[in-house]
A protein has these predicted regions:
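A residue-level marker of the well-folded mature domains of exported/periplasmic proteins
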Residues: 9, 18-154
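Bacterial N-terminal signal peptides
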Residues: 2-14
Length: 154
């Protein structure tokens, strides 16, 4: 999944690379500082930004607090970046800040968590990710078909 997100972000930036030089994008994730999974994403956006001549800033709530994440999205939008990339870790908590960014004319791309329908309802340009419920359900069906009676889906 992380490779898919990195590729999608790279392609998104590459699509407008001629006009992107000097632009600033902010990626806001829900991950606490202790979540090392996001290091792949941090490295990918840094490399994509360097390659395309754009600034890409990674921001997150240090403890994973979603109210803090909402404030980070608001602060990011107030800085008027050329785009915001964000997770939808909790639709109800993040709905307002994301919609305000869109109303300011800031393009938003939703990644990783949430659903395509939620992203659309918030005004995001696109959703790149795998809805957790659908992924878990699909894994359960495959396990059932394979005769597995107990497993842990992470």
């Amino acid at each position: 999944m992380s490779g898919a997100i990195a590729i999608a972000l790279g392609l998104t930036f590459a699509a407008g690379s001629v006009q992107a030089a000097g632009e600033k994008y902010i990626l806001v994730s829900h991950a606490p500082d202790s979540d090392s999974w996001w290091n792949t994403i941090k490295n990918a956006i840094r490399e994509a930004g360097d390659h395309l001549g754009v600034e890409v800033v990674y921001r997150n709530p240090p403890t994973g607090d979603l109210a803090d994440m909402a404030r980070i999205i608001e602060q990011s939008a107030a800085s008027r970046p050329d785009g915001i990339i964000t997770t939808i870790a909790d639709y109800d908590v993040l709905k307002g800040p994301i919609q305000k960014a869109v109303k300011r004319g800031i393009p938003v791309i939703a990644i990783n968590s949430g659903t395509p329908d939620q992203a659309r309802s918030l005004g995001a340009l696109m959703y790149v990710g795998q809805p957790e419920y659908d992924a878990g359900y699909g894994a359960g069906m495959k396990a059932k078909d394979a005769g597995v009676t107990k497993f842990l889906c992470v």
